[in-house]
């Protein structure tokens, strides 16, 4: 592997990390070392103030922070070093666990001061240091031996993920970043990599917010309410100015003028059109919050017209990651399947949960406002996992059983994704699975594919070659699930109890929907598999299946077991 190969990996990986259709395991991560420090600071504040009730929330965030701190070489420590910081974190966890769910006030304030100091020292410089680190890793002149291929790419991969996180943290939208790096990859002007990389660095380090005009089209059901809203809210107009109308050539619907149509027009500054649309939508929401009587029957818009000096374009308010489970090509008929379950399965408890969850999934999918989506997806998940005993915490059951369901299916899901990926590249025949190929056939395919695919295949091969490696692979996935489920629950509490709306709600909502849909599909598979059961089934049988299977797969950790003992069928997308 030479320098040009590594540079090609950078281009391919940036596009993959930012693409909405990429498997969640390969998309940009939730945090880098800077964003996790910021998140930890907010969690410590909430812990001090009593808004966070469980030390476990703090504990999980510290564990995640330690992992990122340990890997990162760009972060600057003002008056301590990495080892001392990790020791301080360990000491705080040990002292706090002794107090159970009581706050160590002095220790928390000291740690909060330390975290805030490190965050402040790195907040404005991390992007440049991360780009410089990547450039250093991409400029290695000597050929890299095959034995060092995966470790070398692992290191580059960490900083690519950190860079993507940093772009998002600083206020870029994922859709803008994807478009930018797609052009970078395609390189239709044949610009040398060093020149293109330097230009990219200059663009992002010197980038400033631009001026945009954002227009939402409002369709009222009541013309009296439309006029009242126009009179009360300064940004609502009956028709767009002549200058704007003249500039609109491809969106004629924005030129309509009648008693029921109004336009919400706001001027905003932002780094790109995706972000400015979301910021303008927040303004629209805030104005409507104080004028409820005028917008009772108004459906919130999901798109906007965005204008600046050089273009006019339509933008969605929110871009969600792909709903479709991309490891399976065809979905099964949901309605017919549900009918057969009703007719053939003794499972009133599970069916009631399934129907309620499906109802809230549908309601969530139909919502424009992100808070309503999130809450309905969470309600649906609670319907599935709730205990009939009020003394049992639904969240504790979600945190215990949801990772078991997902970890049992993780290996098979990822292999099916690899299969589909390789078939798309015309190097794997239909009905053939990567895991069943001989080592010789695998080597042939590895020699035919691009460097990103080669890396994926070698990583998968290494993880599947020995039981201990596979166990570690599953354990890491479970840890990440526990971190993220705890994060989702914290955001749920903030949304419900504090009416707080977070910038990362879109990504978290996409993740929550994936967990919900995957669980629902597994629940349907469970009912189909047990259609001839003479025993009345309830949710404990479904959860118990995965609890036992999880224990078994930890002991008998073979590819054959992972592939044969779970079904990944798609009824809901």
Short names for language-model regions:
Residues 31-133:
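N-terminal accessory alpha/beta regions
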Residues 94-372, 379, 506-571:
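Charged, non-catalytic interaction/linker regions at domain boundaries
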Residues 61, 74, 130, 164-165, ...:
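Generic recognition of cysteine residues
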Residues 56-59, 69-90, 219, 227-245, ...:
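Extended alpha-helical regions
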Residues 3-56, 325-573:
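Amphipathic, oligomerization/interface secondary-structure segments
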